[in-house]
Amino acid sequence: MQPPIPAPLKHVSRTPATPAVAKALTRLQCWPGEQRVAVGLSGGVDSSLSAALLVEAGWQVEGLTLWLMSGKGACCSDGLIDAAGICEQLKIPHHVVDSRATFQAEIVDQLVQGYQQGVTPLPCSRCNRSVKFAAMLSWAEKERQLHRVATGHYARIRHREDPEPQQALPGDSSGRHQLLRGLDQNKDQSYFLYDLSQDVLAKVIFPLGELTKAETRQEAERYGLRTAKKAESQDLCLADHYGSMKAFLDNYLPARQGEIVLQDGKVVGEHDGIEHFTIGQRKGLGVAWREPLHVVQLDATANRVIVAPRAEAGRDSCVVGAVNWISIAPPSSAIDVEVQVRYRSGPVAAQLIPIEATAEDIAADRPHRCRLTFNEEQFSITPGQAAVFYAADAVLGGGLIQQINTASS
């Protein structure tokens, strides 16, 4: 038997704090079909307000927290306590799903393996696809017969049944749900969501997609939510859990000294592990040289960090594999796109050309691959990170950077 539909929050004024909040509430109130949802609660202010807005809009809401790691931290006991407290405030049920084994196998072990191979992995997009949304939807449907989940991500989805017209995109987008950037450019998280499937997009709600972080804080305080003034966690939950990414890596990988060299092989310094470096890095190299040096390659076989002056560090082409086309069908010919190659970097113009997939990608059921040629040289194209393709604020797709090269190579 399902729990009763919770009453709207009585202590909240009926006048939303901002027009964006009013628009979000109206959209939720007018949502077609069954208004029952599981809200992923991390214990932070973003997911807390998402739950509060859904309750205010009259939805039947159940809180769901994934237990990802043991110990203290945003993903652990501290987050669980705050998530439970929010559910108590909102008078909604709270459930905890133990996902530690899946998180260890799919994220931690894969992350460590990637660093050992000399790449800089992007665990957040993999976690969204393989752990978070998979676990939430599986639990919601099997245990509570709930067919939608909501989270506090700053992104938007233009569902195909929405009354608002879909964006015109380069490529075939007919019959597809479209993933869009969040309106707050400083908090937009669409970069980490490119790998979701159409089936998942159909069942997901992002109540904060039209809000800024400041509006979220303001509205959370208006609700009196216990997490309204909670400090931001780090972008990477593992860094938050261990105190820093270096502490996480030191916990799993023993120090392995090697050389820092120029592209011609000249030794200019030493390092304690290639996993502590990333492409484009300039600070913290521990190298005294006549001009600033940038990391241009991590050679796992030779255990070397390869550096170069900025004039030699630019790259204008890369190969992207395991591509997921989310808002359009896979293109058969070249298209012009904007590309984001790091979460905190802005989009840059490039031409995308589909190329033949590797046997490894095909075996993993990820048969799409492409070459990107950038209009201007880039200095932080990093194997293991995602290259996400945009048209204006729509996410066309994305994949993992496999190879960096110049246009002539």
Swiss-Prot record:
The record marks 153, 385 as: Interaction with tRNA. Residues 156-179 are annotated as: Disordered. It is found in: Cytoplasm. One of its GO terms (cellular component) is cytoplasm. GO terms for biological process: tRNA wobble position uridine thiolation. It catalyses: S-sulfanyl-L-cysteinyl-[protein] + uridine(34) in tRNA + AH2 + ATP = 2-thiouridine(34) in tRNA + L-cysteinyl-[protein] + A + AMP + diphosphate + H(+). The keyword tRNA-binding applies. It comes from the Bacteria. Its EC number is 2.8.1.13. Catalyzes the 2-thiolation of uridine at the wobble position (U34) of tRNA, leading to the formation of s(2)U34. Belongs to the MnmA/TRMU family. This is tRNA-specific 2-thiouridylase MnmA. It comes from Prochlorococcus marinus (strain MIT 9303). The gene is mnmA.
